[in-house]
């Protein structure tokens, strides 16, 4: 029996929703082919990732076996389509693909259990079980995390098109979290609450200009910009080119912008990066479906 699973990249935080908002996008994605085997084995292609015990897809699959007290094994062939350390939920997608592939092989359909195994994989990769990547990659669409334990998720019916720009810069999630303060000024917290609440309404109404204006953040971005000294200049160029707004995806360096002329916006940002001596690529994307077999 062979199972094929695709798990999409995600835009986590989505502006003011730090550790809460996340949206699946239609590309890129990680793909696994899972089959029965007498031990646990991983074969990977695409972007380079660890093999063996440190592979997140394999770790998540093994975690599900342990949770179910099932002995045995499986072989995973991973086609890594999401660049690691990109800010696009690379480890979360691998975790979802591995856990869901194992679940399908075992005939398990318990969403909560599968997500728990995937979040263990995400925790191994980044030090914390981030549901704002794992959950939208699993379910698709735009998700809001009410709580991690117990896991409570809300869904927003949002259909967006945007442009992702990915510079050739790596920002490990653990490093991006370490730079954050343990406390922030009250006025910054209040501002984020206002923006996040308004963003949900704008998403429901499909108000692109308002959504763009609200793609901002006072909790993490002011501190993480130290790891992205080019951000303010890139943001200025994007807005001048017609973007309604631009934000950092996850912990970066990937950027997500919305507007009308998405190809022009992406091309202009890439050209600006090249002026700064940084290679970059862009692609137009949209709200995506969740992991599927």
UniProtKB/Swiss-Prot annotation:
Protein name as it appears in the record: Homoserine kinase
Summary of the function given for this chain in its UniProt record: Catalyzes the ATP-dependent phosphorylation of L-homoserine to L-homoserine phosphate.
Catalysed reactions, as listed in the record: L-homoserine + ATP = O-phospho-L-homoserine + ADP + H(+)
GO cellular-component term (any): cytoplasm
Gene: thrB
Binding residues for ATP: 83-93
UniProt keywords, alphabetically: Amino-acid biosynthesis, ATP-binding, Cytoplasm, Kinase, Nucleotide-binding, Threonine biosynthesis, Transferase
SUPFAM superfamilies per record: GHMP Kinase, C-terminal domain (SSF55060), Ribosomal protein S5 domain 2-like (SSF54211)
Top enzyme category: transferase
Organism from which the protein derives: Pyrococcus horikoshii (strain ATCC 700860 / DSM 12428 / JCM 9974 / NBRC 100139 / OT-3)
Pathway field: Amino-acid biosynthesis; L-threonine biosynthesis; L-threonine from L-aspartate: step 4/5
Record-listed E.C. numbers: 2.7.1.39
């Amino acid at each position: 029996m062979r199972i094929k699973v695709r798990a999409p990249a995600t835009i986590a935080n989505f502006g003011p929703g730090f550790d809460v908002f996340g949206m699946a996008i239609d590309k890129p994605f990680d793909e696994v082919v899972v089959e029965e085997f007498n031990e646990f084995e991983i074969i990977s292609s695409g972007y380079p990732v660890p093999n063996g015990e440190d592979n997140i897809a394999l770790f998540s699959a093994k975690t599900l076996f342990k949770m179910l007290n099932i002995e045995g094994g499986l072989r995973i062939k991973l086609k890594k389509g999401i660049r690691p350390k990109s800010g696009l939920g690379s480890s979360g997608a691998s975790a979802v693909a591995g856990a869901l592939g194992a679940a399908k092989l075992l005939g398990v359909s318990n969403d909560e259990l599968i997500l728990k195994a995937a979040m263990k994989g995400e925790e191994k990769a980044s030090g914390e079980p981030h549901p704002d990547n794992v959950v939208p990659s699993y379910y698709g669409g735009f998700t809001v995390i009410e709580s991690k334990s117990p896991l409570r998720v809300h869904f927003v019916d949002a259909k967006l098109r945007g442009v992702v720009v990915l510079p050739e810069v790596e920002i490990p999630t653990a490093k991006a979290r370490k730079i954050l303060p343990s406390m922030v000024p009250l006025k910054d917290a209040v501002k984020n609450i206002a923006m996040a609440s308004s963003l949900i309404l704008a998403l429901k109404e499909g108000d692109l200009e308002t959504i763009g204006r609200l793609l901002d953040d006072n909790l993490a971005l002011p501190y993480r910009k130290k790891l992205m000294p080019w951000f303010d200049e890139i943001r200025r160029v994007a807005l001048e080119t017609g973007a309604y707004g631009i934000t950092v995806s996850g912990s970066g360096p990937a950027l997500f912008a919305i507007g009308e002329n998405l190809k022009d916006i992406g091309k202009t940002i890439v050209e600006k990066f090249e002026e700064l001596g940084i290679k970059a690529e862009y692609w137009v994307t949209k709200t995506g479906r969740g992991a599927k077999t």
